[in-house]
């Protein structure tokens, strides 16, 4: 509950103490015990070993992580090749613009960022269109999403839209 509420309360005999608990979790883990899966030439883990390894992170904890991604090994050509990348200044500018959009949108709701969206605020200020509702219904059923997972997708989608200056 502290992750959702942004506060943690400790009850002791002499009273209750409440502390802020806003944080951003950034975590990484190997795909298996040896770290080389899915490269079967270097990974010697059995399927059961991989499954047990991945189950070390509890479902309820995973359900509270907004974005999970798999990273492929970097190819040599990517390290040495010249390619156009967005500058840090350009990214910073987009993020600040997204923050301004969020602060303006949620001013009356008493929040500042998409990460603070409650179910009620999402329903009032981030209504889904017919097409989006259909997509979310299909995702809810096929991915067997929890309510938390459903609203997490909407919060992340709202953030992506803000970064792309879209409604």
Question: Where is each model-derived feature located?
Answer:
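Basic, amphipathic alpha-helical bundle interface domains used for macromolecular binding and assembly
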Residues: 2-167
């Amino acid at each position: 509950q502290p992750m959702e509420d942004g506060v943690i309360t400790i009850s002791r005999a002499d009273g209750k103490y409440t502390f802020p608990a806003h944080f951003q979790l950034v975590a990484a883990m190997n795909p298996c015990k040896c770290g080389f899966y899915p490269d079967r030439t270097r990974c010697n883990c059995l399927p059961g070993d991989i499954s047990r390894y991945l189950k070390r992170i509890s479902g309820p904890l995973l359900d509270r992580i907004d974005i999970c991604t798999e990273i492929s090994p970097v190819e040599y050509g990517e390290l040495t090749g010249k390619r156009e990348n967005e500058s840090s200044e350009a990214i910073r500018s987009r993020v600040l613009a997204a923050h301004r959009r969020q602060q303006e949108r949620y001013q009356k709701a008493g929040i500042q960022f998409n990460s603070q969206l409650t179910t009620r605020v999402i329903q009032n200020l981030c209504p889904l269109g017919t097409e989006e509702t259909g997509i979310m219904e299909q995702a809810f059923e096929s991915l067997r999403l929890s309510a938390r997972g459903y609203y997490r997708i909407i919060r992340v989608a709202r953030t992506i839209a803000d970064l792309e200056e879209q409604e």
